[in-house]
């Protein structure tokens, strides 16, 4: 059976889709057959970040409503042999996303015929239908937050939903929760403009999976249709690679928590 991981948050604009793209890509680069599903019906951004928007013919709702097969709707990634994208619909009503339909998709992806090992669910923000469907079947959840009070507070609400409205919760179990902090700037934390990692951990009380530093490279990668994890010697890329390692049970020291110390020459010449 495939492991189902939902990337979620209480607030929009925290980098969920960027994170979903890089985590799915990172797992595929490690050799795992991975599907990443866009649950944001009506908006659809995952295909843009993955650089496959011109190859979308069918979408998740087409599959759920029997208008296309999974094989017809899945888009093979141009960079990773083991990675496939299932886009959301831009035109359908969100109510078309049914629990029975999503369950059928998950079962087919997990089955022997398709043989996916990981399914990454890119959830819309908040508690709308797409978000509830994305998290319902999750084995694990990556709760994504910016180091801002409103973002962290809204993430706390999502934790409550995971603990009460997921399939695992209904069965008396629990979804394994991870905390991912995005757009983190130690310099801004030092100035009191952002919450610190410790502040966020103290509020949410879930294990820290990783810290993604604030970086223009993330925006540039998204605009070019390539997940930032593909970039070499870029802090955000290295941070996502660390996240993949920790998801797979490997020990990695937390990085990017402190401000980068400038060399003597950079300080001297203002670089």
From Swiss-Prot:
Record keywords, A-Z: ATP-binding, Cell cycle, Cell division, Cell inner membrane, Cell membrane, Membrane, Nucleotide-binding, Septation
Q: Which Pfam families match?
A: CbiA
GO cellular component terms, semicolon-separated: cytoplasmic side of plasma membrane; cytosol
Compartments in which it is found = Cell inner membrane
* UniProt-annotated binding residues for ATP: 11-18
- Specify where it is mainly localized: membrane
For biological process, the GO terms are:
division septum assembly
Q: Which InterPro entries match?
A: CobQ/CobB/MinD/ParA_Nub-bd_dom, MinD, MinD_FleN, P-loop_NTPase, ParA/MinD_ATPase
Q: List the disulfide bonds.
A: none
UniProt keyword Cell inner membrane present: yes
Membrane topology category: Peripheral membrane protein
Task: List the Gene Ontology MF annotations in alphabetical order.
Answer: ATP binding; ATP hydrolysis activity
Family statement drawn from the similarity comment of this UniProt entry: Belongs to the ParA family. MinD subfamily.
Q: How does it assemble?
A: Interacts with MinC and FtsZ.
Job description of the protein: ATPase required for the correct placement of the division site. Cell division inhibitors MinC and MinD act in concert to form an inhibitor capable of blocking formation of the polar Z ring septums. Rapidly oscillates between the poles of the cell to destabilize FtsZ filaments that have formed before they mature into polar Z rings.
Note in the entry: Present in outer membrane vesicle formulations which are used as vaccines in human.
- What name appears for this protein in its UniProt entry? Septum site-determining protein MinD
Organism of provenance: Neisseria meningitidis serogroup B (strain ATCC BAA-335 / MC58)
């Amino acid at each position: 059976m495939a492991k189902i991981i939902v990337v979620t948050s209480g607030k929009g604009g925290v980098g969920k889709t960027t994170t979903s793209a890089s985590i799915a890509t990172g797992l595929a680069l490690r050799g795992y057959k991975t599907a990443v599903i866009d649950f944001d019906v009506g908006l659809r951004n995952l295909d843009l970040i993955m650089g496959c928007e011109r190859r979308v013919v069918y979408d998740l709702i087409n599959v759920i409503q029997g208008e296309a097969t999974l094989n017809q709707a899945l888009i093979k990634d141009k960079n990773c042999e083991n990675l496939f994208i299932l886009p959301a619909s831009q035109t359908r009503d969100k109510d078309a996303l049914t629990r029975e339909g999503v369950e059928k998709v998950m079962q087919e992806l997990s089955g022997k015929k398709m043989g996916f090992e990981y399914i990454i669910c890119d959830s819309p923000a908040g508690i709308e239908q797409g978000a509830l469907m994305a998290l319902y079947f999750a084995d694990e959840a990556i709760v994504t937050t910016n180091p801002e009070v409103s973002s962290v507070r809204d993430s706390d609400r999502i934790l409550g939903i995971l603990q009460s409205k997921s399939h695992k919760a209904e069965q008396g179990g629990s979804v394994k929760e991870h905390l991912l902090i995005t757009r983190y700037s130690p310099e801004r934390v030092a100035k009191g403009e952002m919450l610190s990692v410790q502040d966020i951990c103290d509020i949410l009380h879930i294990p820290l999976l990783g810290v993604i530093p604030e970086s223009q490279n993330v925006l540039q990668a998204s605009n070019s249709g390539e997940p930032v994890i593909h970039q070499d010697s870029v802090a955000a890329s290295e941070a996502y690679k660390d996240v993949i390692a920790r998801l797979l049970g490997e020990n990695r020291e937390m990085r990017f928590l402190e401000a980068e110390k400038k060399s003597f020459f950079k300080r001297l010449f203002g670089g």
